[in-house]
């Protein structure tokens, strides 16, 4: 059975690169009727926080990527890691190293002075016929993995193709710190082994970790998963996305009024494609997805295209759901939709005009309360006899028996003819008086929804 995993470190927010990794891992499992596992890699005790764990879990819930197993926490598995470390020590695949911090710094300085690549010189590595230094007093050793001294580590990456790295490029990795706590690269190996992960789909910043992890798996006689390393997501300037310059957190996008399905849809298109299809559901994505179709090249985040896609998802969204999503925004603006037109009817009229939920809430508010118009709009559209003219139009509105967009529309042409004005000289003042803005859908439809009594009240002040 196919088993994939998403394994974030809780040292900050859930960023969009992580969401795309989770999405591709989730989709591959769903496509193949497999299992998707969530693992929290929290061995960095100084940087991992409960707040970050919550942000990850909340983010996964918001985007709707459901997991079949987990969340598993590495900090709950320390006994298992110690057991496997001892197994490697007993089998001769790991050893204790008593180098002090000062020795390692001196070693690095000497190597850099010679122009060599800084690396541990394996002085504590046991070999046949080699005499090890005397164990110093007061030094707690680390445990290092015995990396093969020759040969290559090779794997067929599901995204990048064949990758080969010489063991001569690798040093003897520390797998346990002086206090006995296991290190990241080691925990990952044990977790993937124990959790029977068949496909490791992750960012290409992990490519250099892969040969080290493969060597450890081989030393444990454990099966090797298929590795697939996803390319980086760049910003529009072609630079790595950063929290300072770019909206990269899931929370950022939620606050900006993005629909989760729109974010997933767009992230799916960053590095993967299905012909010319831009707008699709997650059900379609799962049906179409394959690792072979993932590009090994980095992708640029195009904000304009992303917002266009969010607009398409808003248009396609159920109005009842949209009402739920914008309810907190309306409440914060003291807009009460319980009194006034049916919110579903309002959303049906305005949702094609916006690109995000924040803008949608702004489009909705004037149906329930008049905005204070901008001074420039008042000066431009309500100067001279415009207000008196609107009063005369209100009288005609008041005489209507049927309050519909059609009956309201039928008043426009004869009124403009009687007043000797153009339609813009009626429509714009109406918008400013009734809605407090010049930007609305068709004014007859807006007036029909707001209701006769409220429209007359707003016009007549």
Curated annotation (Swiss-Prot):
GO MF annotation: an example: tRNA binding
Organism of derivation: Chromobacterium violaceum (strain ATCC 12472 / DSM 30191 / JCM 1249 / CCUG 213 / NBRC 12614 / NCIMB 9131 / NCTC 9757 / MK)
Subcellular location: Cytoplasm
GO BP annotations, alphabetical order: glutamyl-tRNA aminoacylation
Function: Catalyzes the attachment of glutamate to tRNA(Glu) in a two-step reaction: glutamate is first activated by ATP to form Glu-AMP and then transferred to the acceptor end of tRNA(Glu).
First-level EC class: ligase
Gene field: gltX
PROSITE patterns for the chain: AA_TRNA_LIGASE_I
Gene Ontology CC annotation, any one: cytosol
Domain of life: Bacteria
Reaction(s) the record says it catalyses: tRNA(Glu) + L-glutamate + ATP = L-glutamyl-tRNA(Glu) + AMP + diphosphate
Main location: cytoplasm
Protein name, UniProt field: Glutamate--tRNA ligase
């Amino acid at each position: 059975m196919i088993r994939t995993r998403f394994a974030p470190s809780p040292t900050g927010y859930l960023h969009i690169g992580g969401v795309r990794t989770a999405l591709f891992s989730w989709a591959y499992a769903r496509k193949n009727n497999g299992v998707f596992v969530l693992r929290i890699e929290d061995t960095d005790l100084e940087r991992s926080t409960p707040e970050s764990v919550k942000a990850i879990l909340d983010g996964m819930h918001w985007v709707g990527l459901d997991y079949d197993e987990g969340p598993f926490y590495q900090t709950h598995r320390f006994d298992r890691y110690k057991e496997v470390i001892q197994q490697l020590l007993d089998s001769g695949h790991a050893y204790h190293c008593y180098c002090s911090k000062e020795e390692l710094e001196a070693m690095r300085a000497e190597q850099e002075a010679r122009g060599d690549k800084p690396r541990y010189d394996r002085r504590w590595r046991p070999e046949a016929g080699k005499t090890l230094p005397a164990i110093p007093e007061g030094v707690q050793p680390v445990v290092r993995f015995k990396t093969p001294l020759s040969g290559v580590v090779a794997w067929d990456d599901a995204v990048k193709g064949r990758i080969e790295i010489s063991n001569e490029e690798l040093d003897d990795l520390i797998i346990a710190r002086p206090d006995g706590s296991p290190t990241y690269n080691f925990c990952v190996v044990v977790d993937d082994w124990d959790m029977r992960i068949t496909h490791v789909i992750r960012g290409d910043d992990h490519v250099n970790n892969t040969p080290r992890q493969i060597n450890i798996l081989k030393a444990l006689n454990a099966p090797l998963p298929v590795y697939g390393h996803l390319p980086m997501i760049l910003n529009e300037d072609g630079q790595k996305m950063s929290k300072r310059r770019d909206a990269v957190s899931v929370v950022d996008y939620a606050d900006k009024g993005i629909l989760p399905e729109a974010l997933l849809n767009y992230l799916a298109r960053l590095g993967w494609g299905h012909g010319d299809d831009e707008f699709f559901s997650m059900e379609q994505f799962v049906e179409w997805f394959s690792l072979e179709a993932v590009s090994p090249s980095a992708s640029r985040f195009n904000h304009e295209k992303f917002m266009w896609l969010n607009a398409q998802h808003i248009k396609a969204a159920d109005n009842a759901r949209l009402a739920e999503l914008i309810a907190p925004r309306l409440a914060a603006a003291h807009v009460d939709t319980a009194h006034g037109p049916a919110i579903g009817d309002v959303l049906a009229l305005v949702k094609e005009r916006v690109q995000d939920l924040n803008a949608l809430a702004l489009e909705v508010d004037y149906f329930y309360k008049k905005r204070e118009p901008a001074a420039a709009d008042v000066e431009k559209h309500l100067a001279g006899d415009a207000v008196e003219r609107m009063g005369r139009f209100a009288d005609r509105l008041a005489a209507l028996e049927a309050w519909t967009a059609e009956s309201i529309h039928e008043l426009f042409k004869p009124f403009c003819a009687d007043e000797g004005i153009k339609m813009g000289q009626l429509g714009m003042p109406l918008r400013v008086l009734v809605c407090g803005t010049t930007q609305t859908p068709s004014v007859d439809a807006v007036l029909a929804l707001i209701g006769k009594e409220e429209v007359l009240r707003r016009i007549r002040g």
